[in-house]
Amino acid sequence: AQHYYVDESNGLKYELDYEKHTAELIEQQGTSGSNFDYSSLYSAEKYVVPSYVADEGVRYKVTKLGASCFYNATNLKEVVLPATIEEIGNGAFIRCRELKKLQLNEGLKKIGEQCFKYTYSLEQITIPASVTEIGKLLFNLMKNNQQLTITCLSSSPAEVKGDMSIYSEFYAHHTLVVPRGCEAAYKKHPIWGKFFVTDYTDTATGFKYKLNATAKTAILVRNTDADGKSLYTATNYVPSTVKDGNGVEYVLTELGDHCFVGNDKRYAWDAELNNEILQSIVLPPTVKKIGWACFNRCLNLKDVQLPEQLEELSDSCFAVCISLDG
């Protein structure tokens, strides 16, 4: 039989194990919508999860955040976890769009899959050394421009059940911090190693890249001044490879989102987005993907030579390219 307890002070609901004297924090569903898009009754901006809860004079140790326990808690910005938590269930923080920072407790052993899906505001997360297992797609469907910093405290990489996102470019947009002297161990890992991506600007061309040190691939990204104005002007040829400062060669495989937009700090209808200089561009055969709104508002762009091997042309790639033929 299932036994439940609701803490009246904060509304948190627990499933109690009478034999083990443990408690699991579970979800509280609110109103339902289509496709299981129900709201959460956890409406506060901050929750402090206790180490123990008491029901009818019996204490229960809180050891787990259940699956989807904070699902769609749209106001949630901060959660403080006790040292007693050993497991975080699948999808525990899905759609917590305001959650910005999370310090996971030492003693945590397992993090479930898709735990931080759609956490669009998440900026920092620390994974303690005690974590030994992480589910697949942990950061699935997050925004590339979040600039998430993931700090791992263990000297050896935790086991990961699969890629952390369905999008391969995820690793190029976020940062992994590991203990000093442990970089080699993480670089060798098939998943963690994908995070070893560095920014590099080719002074000869002015092109800015995200370099993946593991795959030896490059993504061409926006290069802007302090006001967000694009530094790309009359460019018409993009090279297939780039060498970093150490002479290591990387193959260009992708053009990033809004790469040639005139200004990235303006609204989509603002004229300062316009790039009025670029007229033609030739892309190398190594490019497999062109990102979202890559050439948006390149008003005088007339000719684009796309590679035959191109696999993905993202939405709004040539939006408002009013001079482009055919």
Each language-model region and where it sits:
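Extracellular/surface-exposed low-complexity segments
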Residues: 1-3, 173-204
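N-terminal segments that cap or nucleate solenoid repeat domains
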Residues: 2-57, 68-72, 201-248, 253-260
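Structural signature of tandem-repeat unit edges
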Residues: 37-63, 74-87, 97-110, 120-133, ...
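Consensus positions within tandem repeat domains that build extended binding/scaffold surfaces
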Residues: 66-69, 89-94, 112-115, 135-138, ...
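A structural signal for leucine-rich repeat
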Residues: 139-141, 163-169, 190
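Extracytoplasmic/secreted cell-surface and envelope-processing proteins
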Residues: 159-162, 185-187
